[in-house]
Amino acid sequence: MDKRIILDDKAIDRTLTRIAHEILENNKGAHDLVLLGIRTRGIYLAQRIQSKIEKIDGITVPTGVLDVTQYRDDITDRVSQDVVAYKIDTDMNNRHVVIVDDVLYTGRTVRASLDAILDHVRPKRISLATLIDRGHRELPIRADFIGKNIPTALSEEIVVMLDEVDDKTQVYIK
């Protein structure tokens, strides 16, 4: 199957720098910010954004992991809702939580993320940052911070590769 590279490592770096600036501008600085990366690649994108925010604003933003497996609507065996689906060493109540994901597609993962967060805490605000928005939403969800809008056919797939997981950083469509 043919693959077409959309973003190389330098383009991804520039895109994440822009997203970091947009988050800071939207939040009027890094105060009260929390980044939660959706497993798996969203975690590393959140860490990269955290690093960029620290370079820009001099503040280390708390960053954590969000695993929405138990909240997905396509899984029938549910785990107890007492199990917290995120790992972060800070209180997220009354903070601006930014969910970070690699590809926004149907919106179902984001819906599960919202459920996972709101079952346990009450943030002041929740925003969504995504590297790629490919369209084809099934739910009324949109990203606040978008790296690239890449309209796709339903038969196409967007693949995000990151050094931390794949030993290569790029985004391609196949």
UniProtKB/Swiss-Prot annotation:
Motif (PRPP-binding): 97-109
Pfam families for the chain: Pribosyltran
Catalysis: reaction(s): UMP + diphosphate = 5-phospho-alpha-D-ribose 1-diphosphate + uracil
Enzyme Commission designation: 2.4.2.9
Matching SUPFAM superfamilies: PRTase-like
The protein's role, per its UniProt record: Regulates transcriptional attenuation of the pyrimidine nucleotide (pyr) operon by binding in a uridine-dependent manner to specific sites on pyr mRNA. This disrupts an antiterminator hairpin in the RNA and favors formation of a downstream transcription terminator, leading to a reduced expression of downstream genes.
UniProt GO MF annotations: RNA binding; uracil phosphoribosyltransferase activity
UniProt entry tagged with the keyword Transcription regulation: yes
Family the UniProt entry places it in: Belongs to the purine/pyrimidine phosphoribosyltransferase family. PyrR subfamily.
Subunit comment: Homodimer and homohexamer; in equilibrium.
Superkingdom of the source species: Bacteria
Originating gene: pyrR
The species this protein was found in: Macrococcus caseolyticus (strain JCSC5402) (Macrococcoides caseolyticum)
One GO BP: DNA-templated transcription termination
Protein name, entry field: Bifunctional protein PyrR
Keyword Transferase: yes
Enzyme's top EC category: transferase
Keywords, ordered alphabetically: Glycosyltransferase, RNA-binding, Transcription, Transcription regulation, Transcription termination, Transferase
